[in-house]
Amino acid sequence: MSYRKLGRTSSQRKAMLRDLTTDLIINERIVTTEARAKEIRKTTEKMITLGKRGDLHARRQAAAFVRNEVADIREEDEAVIVQSALQKLFSDIAPRYAERNGGYTRILKTAPRRGDGALMVIIELV
């Protein structure tokens, strides 16, 4: 299986992909370089597919990859409800794509980055 090294060691690369995938799940749209976006597209699609499966094993596999970050805080009936990125993946995002077989993300090209001319894109959930 081929992958992009992204100029980092394997542990740094894996940590960056976990962070970007978690950010994409939480925000549903992020701005990054084209190479990074093409890599996190793979991991995000796998996480959404696990979310669609919805069983305990899929939840544990996703929990091993997705960072434990707060996705949403809201109040209902004087109780504060905190939703993690994993809960958002399984309760909000996965049901949205129940009828869709793959292709959960979209990459839109934007202007190059001013400092070094890197190709910048917006990656978002469809």
Swiss-Prot record:
Name of the gene encoding the protein in the UniProt record: rplQ
Family according to the record: Belongs to the bacterial ribosomal protein bL17 family.
The entry's keywords: Ribonucleoprotein, Ribosomal protein
Lineage: superkingdom: Bacteria
Protein name: Large ribosomal subunit protein bL17
Disulfide bonds: none
Matching InterPro entries: Ribosomal_bL17 (IPR000456), Ribosomal_bL17_CS (IPR047859), Ribosomal_bL17_sf (IPR036373)
BP-aspect Gene Ontology terms: translation
Subunit details: Part of the 50S ribosomal subunit. Contacts protein L32.
One GO CC annotation: cytosolic large ribosomal subunit
Cross-referenced Pfam families: Ribosomal_L17 (PF01196)
Any one GO molecular function term: structural constituent of ribosome
Lineage: Bacteria, Bacillati, Bacillota, Bacilli, Lactobacillales
Alphabetical list of NCBIfam families matching this protein: L17
